[in-house]
Amino acid sequence: MSRMAEQQLYIHGGYTSATSGRTFETINPANGNVLATVQAAGREDVDRAVKSAQQGQKIWAAMTAMERSRILRRAVDILRERNDELAKLETLDTGKAYSETSTVDIVTGADVLEYYAGLIPALEGSQIPLRETLFVYTRREPLGVVAGIGAWNYPIQIALWKSAPALAAGNAMIFKPSEVTPLTALKLAEIYSEAGLPDGVFNVLPGVGAETGQYLTEHPGIAKVSFTGGVASGKKVMANSAASSLKEVTMELGGKSPLIVFDDADLDLAADIAMMANFFSSGQVCTNGTRVFVPAKCKAAFEQKILARVERIRAGDVFDPQTNFGPLVSFPHRDNVLRYIAKGKEEGARVLCGGDVLKGDGFDNGAWVAPTVFTDCRDEMTIVREEIFGPVMSLLTYESEDEVIRRANDTDYGLAAGIVTADLNRAHRVIHQLEAGICWINTWGESPAEMPVGGYKHSGIGRENGVMTLQSYTQVKSIQVEMAKFQSIF
């Protein structure tokens, strides 16, 4: 693909040049080619976007629920009509295989938007009778202008996960995509405008997180920030949001999730789940089950089943429909993953497979890392304690149920957890003791629109998807009504 035209900001229903004068480049990580130069939003651009959003939000909130629902449903239709085009752009920008982006990223994002479009008419308050002449009723009102700050691994899906409930509740959103993968969020803005969203209700500000993101989190005109990213960045976002104007926050942060295989499990099923929990999207999924616990007596058999499945991984041309494994999102990220792999070797973990970059035709110019499995891992190892966010699985053994529950919970993270077992009683008994916000039994990874997702501990605050997320983009107003004559004591 030839280099794209310079990408601008999207404010008030159209493209506009950044006033900052700064730009950055986004690359195709499969081959290192520059895709586009992108303008970076500065402080004045954030001010412009907030003013635009404030204007648009008043128009949007004044529409009826059915009017808002119809506009969002039109956006869903356009997303599905343009699925292949958007998936190709997502593949170029992220490096993910087209077989994945064309069937998951846009598809699931559109599903979430459709879900919230259907919920809009059901967003209602309540009536509370107090006595014969006195009652209270409540209204759920939009917050106003909210900000979404996205991560680089699921660019358009995250933009939809954040914008869908925010817009459904009558808010306007200013979205800052990751500077690593900024392209499809701009296309989403076009689609919202085409669907009939009032100007300013969805603005997109590409830029560097340390600058543009900080301007958004500190801006007094922003009522809430929804952030997806790492724990360290999340803490800064939360601190800035609180210090500036006590903004509400939703945080979807990192994970180091346990996948527990019990001795009664079908090991073929367990191996299939472990593969999806570690190598889907080349391991760049926040919920990945990178700590795989297996009974000591099953270790050798499980290792062989994993190795057999690693042989089925097909890395290569990301637009080949048979390819199911792409490069990492960037060269700096690749280098960071390689540092973790080196640390694992240094600390005594045994490399079962992988452990280096992929080499050969088609790989040498890209950010490729081989699918890597470490065995003989210990809980104190760096690769077991810290989030790697790459195709690196750590195998650990255990002897008892109580032991594995304790070790699974021995982490600052609490995003996800899963177990594989044939015993239904054990399944629920163990899941109820795991300290994680998203749990799977005999499966892994699916996050439908109806399912609230989010973390315990350092893995986040609040939830995305589900009914409760729609409510989190509203504020409750209580109105007390007295129908009898008011009695004053004065």
From Swiss-Prot:
Pathway recorded for this protein: Amine and polyamine biosynthesis; betaine biosynthesis via choline pathway; betaine from betaine aldehyde: step 1/1
Q: Provide a Gene Ontology MF annotation, just one.
A: metal ion binding
Which cysteines share a disulfide bond? none
Residues annotated as site: Seems to be a necessary countercharge to the potassium cations: 248
Keywords in UniProt for this one?
Metal-binding, NAD, NADP, Oxidation, Oxidoreductase, Potassium
Listed Gene3D superfamilies: Aldehyde Dehydrogenase, Chain A, domain 1, Aldehyde Dehydrogenase, Chain A, domain 2
Family annotation (NCBIfam families): BADH (TIGR01804), PRK13252.1 (NF009725)
Task of the protein = Involved in the biosynthesis of the osmoprotectant glycine betaine. Catalyzes the irreversible oxidation of betaine aldehyde to the corresponding acid.
Kindly provide the name given to this protein in its UniProt entry: Betaine aldehyde dehydrogenase
The top of its lineage is: Bacteria, Pseudomonadati, Pseudomonadota, Gammaproteobacteria, Enterobacterales
* Gene name in the database record: betB
